[in-house]
């Protein structure tokens, strides 16, 4: 059996285009067990992501958090958040990945009022549980969106209608107020990780040390180790 593998660049940004320039939306009816090492490895993307656990259970690692997702639960991953999914057995995890600009153009009032507060917030993810009323409403909308994608003829307009309903529920039920300190800490950690990953990529044929890797991001050796361990749970050397 051939296993799927996610492709990323040296900063761990996913390189695949989700959807098209005209319709930046993609639906993936995936079984994570069929990926290399039974996981969708560390990656990030500017797009928003919603995943639902229809069968099995999933361990999601988002930023510095570990989240157990049993059957019937889902998760929203915010734009730019480094994350990974892993499983211990076969699963069915339909998910959608789409650009924030699909909901509204960047220079519009809708984008400024309802999209920017979310993608610029300190909230990296939102777990969706069936026993919480508004979270369950989102899960129900997700299943409708999945059904539309599996129909013989794709219904982009119907998909958009459901996405806007979903986004309205998410926006109205969460505190998206920006915390500049939290944003700075999150972005600084991820920027440092990506800088060091870039350095490793550029010098992988050479004999490099932890001190050299840390210096590339202007941090201490202990700081470099902490960023690697807390974000991708491994050592850089």
Predicted regions and their residues:
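Generic protein-terminus/edge-of-domain signal
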Residues: 1-70, 87, 112, 126
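Short hydrophobic/aromatic patch on the recognition helix
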Residues: 72, 223-228
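Ligand-binding loop in jelly-roll beta-barrel domains
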Residues: 80-103, 108-110
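Double-stranded beta-helix
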Residues: 101-126
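Short, Lys/Arg-enriched, Trp-marked, Pro/Gly-tolerant hinge/linker segments that flank
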Residues: 124-135, 148-206, 210-217, 230-237
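Short, Lys/Arg-enriched alpha-helical recognition elements, typified by the DNA-recognition helix
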Residues: 142-145
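Helix-turn-helix DNA-binding motif, specifically the short coil turn and the N-cap/start of the second
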Residues: 220
């Amino acid at each position: 059996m051939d296993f799927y593998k996610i492709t990323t660049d040296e900063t761990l940004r996913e390189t695949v285009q989700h959807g098209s320039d005209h319709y930046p939306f993609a639906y993936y009816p995936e079984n994570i067990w069929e990926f290399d090492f039974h996981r969708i490895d560390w990656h990030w993307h500017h797009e928003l992501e919603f995943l639902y656990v229809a069968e099995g259970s999933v361990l999601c690692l988002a930023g510095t958090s570990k989240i157990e997702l049993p059957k019937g639960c889902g998760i929203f991953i915010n734009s730019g958040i480094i994350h990974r999914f892993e499983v211990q057995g076969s699963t069915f995890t339909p998910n959608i990945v789409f650009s924030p600009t699909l909901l509204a153009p960047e220079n519009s009032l809708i984008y400024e009022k309802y999209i920017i507060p979310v993608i610029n917030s300190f909230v990296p993810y939102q777990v969706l549980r069936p026993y919480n009323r508004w979270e369950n409403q989102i899960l129900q909308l997700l299943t409708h969106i999945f059904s539309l994608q599996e129909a013989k003829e794709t219904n982009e307009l119907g998909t958009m209608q459901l996405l806007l309903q979903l986004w309205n529920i998410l926006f109205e039920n969460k505190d998206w107020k920006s915390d500049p300190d939290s944003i700075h800490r999150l972005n600084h950690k991820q920027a440092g990780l990506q800088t060091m990953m870039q350095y490793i990529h550029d010098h992988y044929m050479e004999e490099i040390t932890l001190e050299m890797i840390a210096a590339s991001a202007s941090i201490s050796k202990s700081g470099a180790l902490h960023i690697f361990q807390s974000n991708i749970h491994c050592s850089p050397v």
